Amino acid sequence: MAECGASGSGSSGDSLDKSITLPPDEIFRNLENAKRFAIDIGGSLTKLAYYSTVQHKVAKVRSFDHSGKDTEREHEPPYEISVQEEITARLHFIKFENTYIEACLDFIKDHLVNTETKVIQATGGGAYKFKDLIEEKLRLKVDKEDVMTCLIKGCNFVLKNIPHEAFVYQKDSDPEFRFQTNHPHIFPYLLVNIGSGVSIVKVETEDRFEWVGGSSIGGGTFWGLGALLTKTKKFDELLHLASRGQHSNVDMLVRDVYGGAHQTLGLSGNLIASSFGKSATADQEFSKEDMAKSLLHMISNDIGQLACLHARLHSLDRVYFGGFFIRGHPVTMRTITYSINFFSKGEVQALFLRHEGYLGAIGAFLKGAEQDNPNQYSWGENYAGSSGLMSASPELGPAQRARSGTFDLLEMDRLERPLVDLPLLLDPPSYVPDTVDLTDDALARKYWLTCFEEALDGVVKRAVASQPDSVDAAERAEKFRQKYWNKLQTLRQQPFAYGTLTVRSLLDTREHCLNEFNFPDPYSKVKQRENGVALRCFPGVVRSLDALGWEERQLALVKGLLAGNVFDWGAKAVSAVLESDPYFGFEEAKRKLQERPWLVDSYSEWLQRLKGPPHKCALIFADNSGIDIILGVFPFVRELLLRGTEVILACNSGPALNDVTHSESLIVAERIAGMDPVVHSALQEERLLLVQTGSSSPCLDLSRLDKGLAALVRERGADLVVIEGMGRAVHTNYHAALRCESLKLAVIKNAWLAERLGGRLFSVIFKYEVPAE
């Protein structure tokens, strides 16, 4: 757990006692609300899973009741804000050494008060060994589940629900982890589980899989033979020896057999011709390190060739590896990857999983929860409560390898609605939301991590100011600061800890940490005030636009969209202006914009397209509240409606920064409809539809959108997608390829990013794209 790591706890008995006496929300979070349990007990590690309800605060908005009033007061806010308690579902997964199982069971027993179940699902070899202990301590009946079924269910679950779950290991890259984007169709695949032996399973669907092969030569062989050869009894110590060894001192290589003639055979002289081949004739003693390395290569090559043969036999090109033998150790992933690449000639991909250690526990939980049908929901990793993929490299010293202390944690929140791909993606399997991978780009990574760290004071200040009546707001805000700061330091050292590191993941982690400490919407009052001001300006803006000629109006509408996008409290350059100059408004923002030609300027092509037939239906992803949505987006929407184009306006399901939420957009649209007959009739006739995206992020992942939105896009035949804002159109989706026309527009409000793109602060991106025929 992160807190144990931060306080210097290790794996000694003393540190366990210290950990176990921490409050339950430090390790077994929300344990008092746990409803269902599952456990996976292996040879050395226990993985506990439980489902709990989580009570947290949410900001709700609703229109004022104006019944009985002749007129609304001029400066009355457009809606009222209330903070309410909401209950959501969360899955918790905890991994710890078997040494601590009894102490952990005692801790659970002492804090378990609301469980609804009388049964705990158990899998793994230890389910038999510890059955009586579990039943005695928890007073729950142990139902043993099939190990392989649990592994498959767990694997399917993480592949579907956790972006960047799978990765390839590349020895010579920096970093070594290359994460894969979520594939919408995960089947079929081969799962190779390397425990004591090896099991190879072909997985064809959610419920159809078969054991197709295996081997008695696996992790247990490495451990057993390694112990005989080196007198080292601990598995991790064996790997540590292997990481420092030189196998060519023990193995007979191709060049040792053929000399220089190996080149005529088309073979590398460094290939192993015979594992341990030199030990039969050499007189010298071999080092423990060299023998461990030779043994590791021998077993990994055997497993790799076996996996490759089965993959080819079943025409599969993806092989996922898991089990005790892997456990995130670079030395094992490196040898497995080399073996697969060699024997398949690069045609089969060796893939590893961030959370492979939890697969059995996840699967056992899913088996026990089948009546609740957990697979009908979408789930999301909660970065605030997860310890991430930490390096378990035996090359690291014990202090570095302590990782997050005695416990590793994973938390997943149940999302309100199922998430699916946008139907308009050109090629969903190849879609990558993020424009820059910060794990690859060291310069950008350093800049953005520093940028988010320097912004912490402002975020804390805003969080406290959003709850003036709360006596503990400052204390909670400081806890938020510490937790997010710790996450940033982890990412400096291990940028791959939560998958691919991006600006989006940094923003989302910050939102998760704010929610963790009950700051659900720090900008709610700012948005309320700015929406009120912008609504009062709306009639005048529309009158000015209507007075223009057609061509002049089109440019004015686009400039209005761009000027509205300036009002982004997440941008330091803008928030500084907004805080220092209360009179900075729509016209001032227009004057900030770059003059044409813009940094990216497809406006002429867009104008030419507008001279053609109207689009059938436009899908618009909105960005900020206030001037952006009201004076920028709605006049643009109104013009499309006048052209005969239906509009789907998609806004965030939940709050993030000052981005407009779906519930806020409903009230704003209602108020605008009261002032504008075009919008009023479009809402009445359902030519203007307001929907939620399913997201609570300042960025946009088009592969995880609300299922209802996707259905509406199909039903209405959307043929234009408009994405506005830096988060949605630059940090994400800048390179997204769609099957229809698209507009991506934003004002660059970060000087470093603007310079990197070849522009200056407040440069304009206006990117109109037409798909190839």
UniProtKB/Swiss-Prot annotation:
Q: Which CDD domains match?
A: ASKHA_NBD_PanK-II_Pank4 (cd24123)
User: PANTHER family from the entry?
Assistant: 4'-PHOSPHOPANTETHEINE PHOSPHATASE, PANTOTHENATE KINASE
Which species does the entry assign this protein to? Homo sapiens (Human)
Q: What is its main location?
A: cytoplasm
For domains, the record's comment is:
Subfamily II proteins have an EGMGR motif about 50 residues from the C-terminus. This motif lies near the metal-binding residues in the putative substrate-binding cleft 2. Subfamily II proteins occur only in eukaryotes, in two forms: as a stand-alone unit in plants, and as a C-terminal domain of pantothenate kinases in plants, animals, and chytrid fungi.
Inhibition and activation profile: Activity is strongly promoted by Co(2+), Ni(2+), Mg(2+) and Mn(2+). Activity is inhibited by EDTA.
- In which residues is acetyl-CoA bound? 196, 199
N-acetylalanine carried by residues: 2
Enzyme class, spelled out: hydrolase
Primary role: Phosphatase which shows a preference for 4'-phosphopantetheine and its oxidatively damaged forms (sulfonate or S-sulfonate), providing strong indirect evidence that the phosphatase activity pre-empts damage in the coenzyme A (CoA) pathway. Hydrolyzing excess 4'-phosphopantetheine could constitute a directed overflow mechanism to prevent its oxidation to the S-sulfonate, sulfonate, or other forms. Hydrolyzing 4'-phosphopantetheine sulfonate or S-sulfonate would forestall their conversion to inactive forms of CoA and acyl carrier protein.
Q: Which residues, renumbered to this chain, carry the PTM Phosphothreonine?
A: 406
- Tissue expression, per UniProt? Widely expressed with high expression in the muscle. Expressed in the retina and lens epithelium, mainly in ganglion cell layer, outer plexiform layer and retinal pigment layer (at protein level).
Q: How is the cofactor bound?
A: Phosphatase activity is strongly promoted by several divalent cation ions but it is suggested s that Mn(2+) and possibly Ni(2+) represent biologically relevant metal ion cofactors for damage-control phosphatases.
Q: Where is this region: 4'-phosphopantetheine phosphatase?
A: 403-773
Reaction catalysed by this enzyme? (R)-4'-phosphopantetheine + H2O = (R)-pantetheine + phosphate; (R)-4'-phosphopantetheine sulfonate + H2O = (R)-pantetheine sulfonate + phosphate; (R)-4'-phospho-S-sulfopantetheine + H2O = (R)-S-sulfopantetheine + phosphate
Family per similarity comment: In the N-terminal section; belongs to the type II pantothenate kinase family. In the C-terminal section; belongs to the damage-control phosphatase family. Phosphopantetheine phosphatase II subfamily.
Q: What is this protein called?
A: 4'-phosphopantetheine phosphatase
- What does the record give under GO molecular function? ATP binding; metal ion binding; phosphatase activity
Task: Please report, in chain numbering, the residue ranges of the motif Subfamily II EGMGR motif.
Answer: 724-728
Which terms in the GO cellular component ontology are assigned? cytosol; nucleus
3'-nitrotyrosine occurs at which residues? 320
Q: Which cofactor does it need?
A: Mn(2+); Ni(2+)
This protein's record includes keyword Kinase = no
Q: Which GO terms describe its biological process?
A: coenzyme A biosynthetic process; pantothenate metabolic process
Return the annotated region ranges for Pantothenate kinase: 2-402
